[in-house]
Amino acid sequence: ELNLSSNGYGETFDFSVLPAQITGIDLTNNDIYNYDNLVKVTVEENGDETVENVHNITKLYLPEEAKYNIAQLMRFYRQNKSAIDGGTMDVKMQNEDGVSEKYNTLREVPDANLRTYLKNNFSDLFNGDNIDISKHLGNEQKTLAVAVMESDNVENFEGLQYLVDNPYWEGTSLALFCNEGSEGTLSYIKVGSTLSTLILQGIKIDNLNLTSANGLYLIRMIDIQNLKDLNISKSSVWGQRSKEVEGDVMVGSYLEVWNCPSLESITLPNKKELKATYLDVEVLPSLKVFDMSNIVMLGRLLIGDLPTSYDLVYPNLTVFYNFDTSVEPTTTFTCSQDTYNRNSTKEFIDKYYKNANPQKLSYFRRLECRLNKGYNWTK
């Protein structure tokens, strides 16, 4: 047996590193959300699954954070349920008080309004008032979008993870809004490969895991508290399609991030050239790292107030597109006065507007964030 309790393990534990002779492991009191290589899952074309244990584990003690994991732990439990129920396999998980209890697949949704929304739209997952993460979504529900609006009056989004990170949910859109003046809470969420649209507004979120979000191309993060990192580098779509697609305001790549006081870094896909229809960053007082230099095409660019310590390096625009070929294609640019006062901004305007023939920037006065005002950079 191996005791790794209180060992400072972070988000992922990889069972492939364990020696073959290890049959018991204690992972309690660690912040582990992902349990890689615990089981091998093979999914057939008809959706049938074959699950195999990768290790001969007969004792597994888990931290509270394990409750969010479905892809590995739920399948491990389902595969070994008879052994767990019969007592030949010992699997426990800590509760919110740190007490280890026998593992089960029932999960709470504390907010009554969120529970009502989920029951109305994703009833297949419920067992009474609890979500049973071992249940499958039927064909009618597995592709439904998630859209929790202000009118739904949700203040605690905990429990939504059990749908969004469910391998049987194939929805492409996740939109969560909290009423202005309220602060919705969501400690951790991981989204999957089918998601293309992610909109979060007015939520306090500690950990947003986008490592599997390779289909993501529209992201809006508005009034988000606590979040330090926004990493969309795993997307194989954002900024990587043709100029005709990326220049289309309906389907082009889109990133809007403002009034996120704790956000320190934004990471784009690491590609030589990126194209997008819309990029807006405003009022990010903690921003340290955001590299836009590999963006070569933008339909609209909005830069609001950013910390003076942040080195603002503008995109190197070489591609311009307008579906109306009778109109000279440009990038529409909006900035705040503080942004305009930066040397890099004035150099950007000189390059693409004042010294360009034809001019490649066009002016629009309004910034989106209510805490910013657009500045007339053409005067």
What are the functions of these language-model segments?
Residues 5-64, 269-336:
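Ankyrin-repeat and related helical/solenoid repeat scaffolds used for protein-protein interactions
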Residues 7, 30, 65-66, 151-152, ...:
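Conserved "Asn-ladder"/turn position within leucine-rich repeats
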Residues 178-217, 222-223:
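Right-handed parallel beta-helix
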Residues 43-51, 237-249:
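Intrinsically disordered, low-complexity Ser/Thr- and acidic-rich flexible linkers and loops
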